[in-house]
Amino acid sequence: MNITIISVGKLKEKYLKHAIDEYSKRLSRYCKLNILELQDEQTPDNASEKDELIIKDKEGNKILNSIKDNMYVITLDLKGKMMSSEELSKFIDNCGVRGNSNLCFVIGGSLGLSEAVLKRSNHSLCFSKMTFPHQLFRVMLLEQIYRAFRISNGEPYHK
């Protein structure tokens, strides 16, 4: 299985980079992982709603240009479906069974995802009603994908 994570914004914190490197290494047993970092657009403090929409659209275009036609796109969005770790494991398994072996998880920037990206999405996933920094969320997503593969393979994992 091929898994791509498209994330808007540059990872700055060393401890997060170390965590991502660790989960990337762990995941290499189960899938081919590709992480794409896209440059985020600067959002002025006094940005209007219109300005924010323009910024989301610019970031959205970068995301859409990075998505290949054969990818099954899973957006991470507050309006998405919540799943347990076990349900995510089954979901990833079912994607493979249905021939969707190129999964693409999309993490938007600080303003979220554009309508165009949400329309391109095959599935929308929500981790929580809470808001997380998108840099930290990348680690959380990798951990859950790793956990999903462990569950799927009947291997021990922390409950």
UniProtKB/Swiss-Prot annotation:
Its EC number(s):
2.1.1.177
Please give the chief subcellular localization of this protein: cytoplasm
This protein's GO cellular component annotations are: cytoplasm
Q: What InterPro entries has UniProt attached to this entry?
A: Alpha/beta_knot_MTases, RlmH-like, tRNA_m1G_MTases_N
Per UniProt, subcellular location reads as:
Cytoplasm
Q: List the molecular function annotations (GO) for this entry.
A: rRNA (pseudouridine-N3-)-methyltransferase activity
Keyword annotations for this protein, in alphabetical order, are: Cytoplasm, Methyltransferase, rRNA processing, S-adenosyl-L-methionine, Transferase
Q: Which SUPFAM superfamilies match?
A: alpha/beta knot
Instruction: Spell out the Gene3D superfamilies in the cross-references.
Output: 3.40.1280.10
Record field: catalytic activity: pseudouridine(1915) in 23S rRNA + S-adenosyl-L-methionine = N(3)-methylpseudouridine(1915) in 23S rRNA + S-adenosyl-L-homocysteine + H(+)
Query: Any signal peptide, and if so, which residues?
Result: none
Q: Which parts of the sequence bind S-adenosyl-L-methionine?
A: 76, 108, 127-132
What quaternary arrangement does the UniProt entry report? Homodimer.
* HAMAP family cross-referenced by the UniProt entry: 23SrRNA_methyltr_H
Family of the protein in this entry: Belongs to the RNA methyltransferase RlmH family.
Q: What does this protein do?
A: Specifically methylates the pseudouridine at position 1915 (m3Psi1915) in 23S rRNA.
UniProt protein name: Ribosomal RNA large subunit methyltransferase H
